């Protein structure tokens, strides 16, 4: 019986024999049984009641991403959690016209980063407690609401006074920051469960959001001379794109491909096919029942006891199977939360520092300092063009991050630190105020191009590599931990950028002062 049934039986009480003795109890060390037909030369030779069979596919085959639909959905996911913020800061011409002489772009950037840092820390705490898709859905709703509210109530209907509108815009940016950051942090944990290319897809989507928003603003400004009308259309287009990303997420999360990767790491062990032994006490017949993984996992503990006696028309059956461990879900303690994060951080510390330094340097300059670059001929078009160049080159950099290059964490960190050279170069484009050292508009465009490519590449590669350095069960936590580092760099960079506002305070009136001085010189009478 033992050689035919399981790989190894333990503690048998009475063995079933050819003289119709009854097996009363036994237990298994393993679910899977060897095929009984392997040792039989004649198909008719078998123990009474035991059928010959072969095991079917034990593990579910890996599903394909047909037509790269899942990759495209993840790219749009990246669009979704940066598109709202980009919408607020890219209409820089409207902001300068409505709030002249204020630091509105700097205030929006700092508000976004401070709220985003708090949101990513909160999300990192509740990552084991709240459902992944609950967090993502909440993020989408918090991002869509302010976009629609500002476009309708402030830009279109103009229901608020100047000071009220200023405060409401900052509050809207803060709400967007909270929702989008929870969404972003959750998506990095989400894609950490998928193959590496999907993390790269999400990060490419972030840059795609910047490109799409920049093109949208340029087109609406060109096609609609009325600044207010173009801004309304601009915000409504952004809200429509955000809604599209949300609906696509709801479809993709139920796909077979995503479910295959996101459900496996949560199990304590892989769910494999098993067998149940049925022994007919009356007739002595014994047969094996094959259980598929889906069937095994769908049964409740009451439906799958270790030892059950059932009655049927053919007699009494005694069923023997292996009890599955009952896992009691409990919230981890604060000490356990810290320990989990410490274990992950020890493995990916270089990647954490690399992404933090990369975004620290970028946020020192973008969008704050870049939005204040002025030119007497191009006017408000120059900051729009400079930001568009950055978004486009950042998009290219994140595509380059998909190249199969093996990086050591320390090398990535060193290259990220070299980007500090962009800070003095951009300062020379705005300082001295009114007559900067690098006045030609080509300079900020070239610097923005190089900074965007390097930001896209060195901001993506650490995030892509980090998830592969930890076990599958730790990948969601690794993605969230990397997002904490990412947001820390953004916060410090925004704080430094806010301090540079004084360098550009007089830039708005520089062209007017130059024109006035030129007119005064022309009016001075010239002697004979």
Swiss-Prot record:
It catalyses: serotonin(out) = serotonin(in); dopamine(out) = dopamine(in); (R)-noradrenaline(out) = (R)-noradrenaline(in); (R)-adrenaline(out) = (R)-adrenaline(in). Pfam families: Nucleoside_tran. GO terms for molecular function: efflux transmembrane transporter activity; monoamine transmembrane transporter activity; monoatomic cation transmembrane transporter activity; neurotransmitter transmembrane transporter activity; nucleoside transmembrane transporter activity; organic acid transmembrane transporter activity; organic cation transmembrane transporter activity; toxin transmembrane transporter activity. Optimum pH is 5.5 for adenosine and adenine uptake. Absence of adenosine transport at pH 7.4. The record marks 206 as: Essential for cation selectivity. Glycans are attached at residue 521. It is found in: Cell membrane; Apical cell membrane. N-glycosylated. Residues 1-68, 123-139, 188-231, 368-376, 433-445, 505-528 are extracellular. Residues 90-101, 161-166, 253-346, 398-411, 467-481 are cytoplasmic. Keywords: Cell membrane, Glycoprotein, Membrane, Transmembrane, Transmembrane helix, Transport. InterPro entries: Eqnu_transpt, MFS_trans_sf. Expressed in heart. Expressed in choroid plexus. Glu-206 is essential for cation selectivity and may function as the charge sensor for cationic substrates. Belongs to the SLC29A/ENT transporter (TC 2.A.57) family. This is Equilibrative nucleoside transporter 4. The lineage of its organism: Eukaryota, Metazoa, Chordata, Craniata, Vertebrata.
């Amino acid at each position: 019986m033992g050689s035919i049934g399981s790989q190894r039986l333990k503690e048998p009480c009475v063995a079933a024999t050819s003289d119709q003795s009854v097996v009363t109890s036994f237990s298994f060390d393993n679910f899977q049984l060897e095929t009984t037909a392997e040792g039989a030369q004649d198909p008719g030779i078998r123990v009474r009641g035991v059928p010959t069979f072969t095991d079917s596919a034990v593990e579910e085959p890996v599903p394909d991403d047909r037509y790269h639909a899942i990759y495209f959905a993840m790219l749009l996911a990246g669009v979704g959690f940066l598109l709202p913020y980009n919408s607020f800061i890219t209409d820089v011409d409207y902001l300068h016209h409505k709030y002249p002489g204020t630091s509105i772009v700097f205030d929006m950037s700092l508000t976004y980063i401070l709220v985003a840092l708090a949101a990513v820390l909160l999300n990192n705490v509740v990552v084991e407690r709240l459902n992944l898709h609950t967090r993502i859905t909440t993020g989408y709703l918090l991002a869509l609401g302010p976009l629609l509210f500002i476009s309708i109530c402030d830009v279109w209907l103009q229901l608020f006074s100047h000071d009220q509108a200023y405060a409401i815009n900052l509050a809207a940016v803060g709400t967007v920051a909270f929702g989008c950051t929870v969404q972003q942090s959750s998506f990095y944990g989400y894609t950490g469960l998928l193959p590496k290319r999907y993390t790269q897809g999400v990060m490419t989507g972030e840059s795609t959001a910047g490109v799409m928003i920049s093109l949208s603003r340029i087109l609406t400004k060109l096609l609609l001379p009325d600044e207010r009308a173009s801004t309304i259309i601009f915000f409504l287009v952004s809200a429509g794109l955000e809604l599209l990303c949300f609906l696509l997420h709801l479809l993709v999360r139920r796909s077979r491909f995503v479910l295959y990767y996101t459900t496996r790491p949560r199990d304590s062990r892989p769910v494999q096919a098993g067998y149940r032994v049925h022994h007919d006490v009356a007739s002595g017949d014994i047969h094996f029942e094959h259980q598929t993984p889906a069937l095994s996992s769908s049964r409740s503990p009451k439906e799958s006891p270790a030892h059950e006696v059932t009655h049927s028309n053919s007699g009494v059956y005694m069923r023997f199977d292996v009890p599955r461990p009952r896992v009691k879900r409990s919230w981890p303690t604060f000490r356990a939360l810290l320990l989990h994060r410490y274990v992950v951080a020890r493995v990916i510390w270089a990647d954490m520092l690399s992404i933090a330094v990369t975004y620290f340097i970028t946020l020192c300059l973008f969008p704050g300092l870049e939005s204040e670059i002025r030119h007497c001929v191009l006017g408000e078009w120059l900051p729009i063009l400079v930001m568009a160049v950055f978004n486009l080159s950042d998009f290219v950099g994140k595509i380059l991050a998909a190249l199969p290059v093996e990086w050591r964490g320390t090398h990535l960190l060193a290259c990220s630190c070299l980007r500090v050279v962009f800070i003095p170069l951009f300062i020379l484009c705005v300082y001295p105020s009114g007559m900067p050292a690098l006045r030609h508009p080509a300079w900020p465009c070239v610097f923005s191009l190089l900074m965007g490519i390097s930001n896209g590449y060195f901001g993506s590669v650490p995030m892509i590599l980090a998830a592969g350095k930890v076990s599958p069960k730790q990948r969601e936590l690794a993605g969230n931990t990397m997002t904490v580092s990412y947001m820390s760099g953004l916060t410090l960079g925004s704080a430094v950028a806010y301090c540079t506002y004084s360098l550009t305070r007089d830039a708005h009136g520089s062209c007017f002062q130059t024109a006035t001085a030129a007119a005064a010189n022309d009016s001075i009478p010239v002697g004979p």
